[in-house]
């Protein structure tokens, strides 16, 4: 509902942004790693205001050279990612958001389209906005997302439960596509 006030929907006051960057540990043919890094370095980010959570040495090294702060190096998980890895990373970034260390959380990864096409993606995970949901519905189809739902619990407690699960699922999906 439009009247819900929750930190996951509002964002923080801190201009710093956490970016979970998924690349490989080794150089691959083509621009696999470089294209993800370009999304960040040539995007609308102030590189000095970024906290990078790196999954993959290539992205970590390139962003470190560009002057970004590497908050966490998770390069060991990019070869065989598990849901537990995604959950640990998600909790770490959510804690940073909850403590006001960052005002937004982003995910940068390479989406597997087919064996020839891999598309770099940059998605804002938090704060969640109505525009983000509308765009996702437009891109992927509604699949019932626009149905009115009635919940027994308070909306805020539902958000407190669902949004971290959504975020961890997005991180895990990115890990699987990038692996």
Residue positions per predicted region:
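C-terminal beta-strand-loop-alpha-helix "lid" module of Rossmann-like NAD(P)-dependent dehydrogenases
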Residues: 1-179
């Amino acid at each position: 509902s439009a009247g819900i006030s929750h930190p996951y929907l509002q964002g923080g006051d801190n201009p710093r942004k956490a970016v979970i960057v998924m690349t490989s540990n080794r150089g691959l043919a083509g621009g696999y790693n470089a294209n993800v890094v370009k999304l960040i370095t040539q995007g609308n980010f102030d590189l000095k205001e970024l906290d990078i959570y790196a999954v993959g040495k290539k992205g970590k090294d390139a962003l470190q050279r560009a002057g970004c702060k590497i908050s966490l190096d998770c390069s060991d998980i990019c070869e065989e990612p598990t849901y537990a890895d995604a959950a640990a990373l998600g909790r770490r970034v959510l804690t940073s958001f909850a403590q006001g260390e960052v005002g937004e959380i982003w995910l940068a990864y390479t989406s597997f389209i087919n064996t020839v096409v891999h598309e770099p993606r940059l998605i804002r995970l938090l704060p969640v906005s109505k525009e983000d949901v509308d765009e996702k519905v437009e891109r992927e189809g509604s699949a019932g997302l626009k149905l009115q739902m009635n919940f027994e619990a308070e909306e805020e407690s539902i958000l407190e439960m669902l949004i971290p699960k959504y975020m961890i699922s997005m991180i895990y999906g990115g890990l699987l596509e990038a692996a």
